[in-house]
Amino acid sequence: MNAHLANEVQTISATARVGPRSLVHVIISSECLAAAGIPLAALMRGRPGLGTAANFQVEIQTRAHATGDCTPWCTAFAAYVPADAVGELLAPVVPAHPGLLPRASSAGGLFVSLPVVCDAQGVYDPYAVAALRLAWGSGASCARVILFSYDELVPPNTRYAADSTRIMRVCRHLCRYVALLGAAAPPAAKEAAAHLSMGLGESASPRPQPLARPHAGAPADPPIVGASDPPISPEEQLTAPGGDTTAAQDVSIAQENEEILALVQRAVQDVTRRHPVRARTGRAACGVASGLRQGALVHQAVSGGAMGAADADAVLAGLEPPGGGRFVAPAPHGPGGEDILNDVLTLTPGTAKPRSLVEWLDRGWEALAGGDRPDWLWSRRSISVVLRHHYGTKQRFVVVSYENSVAWGGRRARPPLLSSALATALTEACAAERVVRPHQLSPAGQAELLLRFPALEVPLRHPRPVLPPFDIAAEVAFTARIHLACLRALGQAIRAALQGGPRISQRLRYDFGPDQRAWLGEVTRRFPILLENLMRAVEGTAPDAFFHTAYALAVLAHLGGRGGRGRRVVPLGDDLPARFADSDGHYVFDYYSTSGDTLRLNNRPIAVAMDGDVSKREQSKCRFMEAVPSTAPRRVCEQYLPGESYAYLCLGFNRRLCGIVVFPGGFAFTINIAAYLSLSDPVARAAVLRFCRKVSSGNGRSR
């Protein structure tokens, strides 16, 4: 919960800068994280509970519908709880008294908060996407992105009504625990338990059950409050009925105050109609408007007379105008008139004595825990947990709302409150015309939607939107589009380089002995097969894994290098060296096996510096750009330069997307990817926004 609290503070401080938006607190289940390819063991290393900083980082990005626009990646607070994630909210553990709230076990999850961008009226686009990037290492292969559309992220209603049973159960468990402590319980906890017991309709003085069976005829002790209550079950809470109605969801503190003020106004009008305001005489003393009951008490204290039945009925009639109390004489008040200043409805400060069961629960909790914490306080108030299912992984996540929260569903949520008006309008329009997609609507239907929601201009009217409109899988389709464009460019570049049967020469210099002539002949004979297997391996790479390769990172660096001077754009992660963009002689390679199945063997690109220009058919020497410490873990292939080992076929690229295919022995040919990579400027910009970040000149690293 602390991650949710921290994200609220961060959002409140940034609201004026980033525009209208809301925040949705979620708990992403361990099953959902695992299905997204995130190793749970990596999230548990260096847990804050063990005294070290968390070994992972979470970043958030908002992606607009159909336009390709994105907000910059920004860091968000997150915490991973390996077990009982929802249970931590519903039944928190007090370190000094771990048995205070028993709870059933449940799955773990990641606590994080996702922003929802909206307009000034709180209307959000259901097809917009919140992207969460979780990195447990510095390389691109040690990060995964989970996408949440606003439609699946924002539930239709909260579920505070389902939480009333839990609050009562927490009170009973506290009474039970205090009774079991007996004389060891703090006096304040005993007092709180006694009041809770009376409020819950149980014995006012709970006592622990005796260890020995009482003899026959002995009076039975009153039962321990909460002794028969089952543990608090997160799964029961998630599946129990109790969804709030839409009207209850929209109720806020401001609306409640408006209703109260309306009732007060009606009462004042009624009193004014019965007793019109009269001009105050010179002898009348200034007074403060008071309720009839308080006025009657003041009159009785001053006059000493007893009230009759008529007076008692008048007490309940309504409020009085200032200076016109029927129980107060028009003459100046004597010494007893100062009692008006002690009117409990106006000037008397509140008492520190708890006035409700919830406040007595607070008193007892603080006495047992030796203090209080914000997360404990929020757990003792109403909590809404809404079970949702993630489209990409088909696993569960939970949307959480707190009574004291300003995020979505919170009782203190600030305007504008999120509204599903756009989603409802799209559904109703499609149903009315019996079409599947909104862009299939008639021109009149589209015009009506555009009049109400101008944000639909690009999805409905743009002839070639960057992303497919009104498609929950639009981001997946866009990633596949970039992947396919890169594969086509690679295939076309290789075919162009090999047209006319060119002679593949030794571009990287290695010396061979006389006894290696037979080996060179065998390798030369296998060149066509090796190249064919290489293309199959590259084409068979899944889109998500493709963006971890040297080829994809070089493409992103090439696209991001168009940003100009001052600030440039680099791929996420630090797979590319900071000096990669400084020279055309800097290459990053992927190594593929030459025996058995052709597979990519390196987890991160291998950076190599060429001493000469390999594109001019001259021999060059190469070296690793960065020395790897001898103690650092690395794969066997990372110990060899391109072409140095017979076991690897190497594919490398520089900042200008000039590529080189290196066979064993240093034999190679060059390719020109940039000449065949066909991406329009809007598509290239959208790719850079999703897979890169801006850095200052001279700093090429980015986690």
Curated annotation (Swiss-Prot):
Family, as annotated: Belongs to the herpesviridae CVC1 protein family.
Gene name for this UniProt entry: CVC1
Cellular component terms per the entry's GO annotation: host cell nucleus; viral capsid
Region: Disordered, residue numbers: 200-246
Function: Capsid vertex-specific component that plays a role during viral DNA encapsidation, assuring correct genome cleavage and presumably stabilizing capsids that contain full-length viral genomes.
Superkingdom, natural source: Viruses
Cross-referenced InterPro entries: UL17-like
Protein name per its UniProtKB record: Capsid vertex component 1
Keyword Calcium among UniProt keywords: no
GO BP of this protein: chromosome organization
Pfam families for the chain: Herpes_UL17
Keyword entries, A-Z: Capsid protein, Host nucleus, Late protein, Viral genome packaging, Viral release from host cell, Virion
Keyword Iron: no
Locations listed in the record: Virion; Host nucleus
UniProt subunit comment: Interacts (via C-terminus) with capsid vertex component 2/CVC2.
